[in-house]
Amino acid sequence: MVRTRIRHRDLRLQLPENPAIDNDERDLLRGRYFEATCAGTDVVGDFVHISSGLSGAGIYTVAKSDPRTKSTMPAVGVIVSKSSTVRCFVQALGELTTSGGMTPGDRYWIALDSQLDNVPPTPLPAELVVAQVVGVALSDEKLLLRPDLAPVILRG
């Protein structure tokens, strides 16, 4: 098993509201990233699911995905930045930079700690886990993030 971590991204220069980017880039970024409310304990690299719909401010609330808890799956993306304790930016798809150690072409899954792993989660006897592929390694440090929204249930 090879564990890899998501690198923190400073998205202030890449947000859709930034006037330095053109309309095409703005539209692309709207599909790749979204701002969300998250728990203070959530960290960069945690895969998350939508836990409640849009607030009046147009912000989703996300919570950590746990393969042992079916109601928290599937994950829709990964936290790539936190602008405050409870405000985060989630990347939903596209190229993602990690800490390295990945094998190009290998599939990557959500681990039991909501982080990235190169093997599916293993259920204990009489346990169920939801196995979700979230991307494919493009290189040692790059993952093509594209969460499978139809994960598989594994039985122990």
What are these regions (language model features)?
Residues 2-8, 13-156:
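Glycine-anchored, exposed beta-strand/edge motif detector
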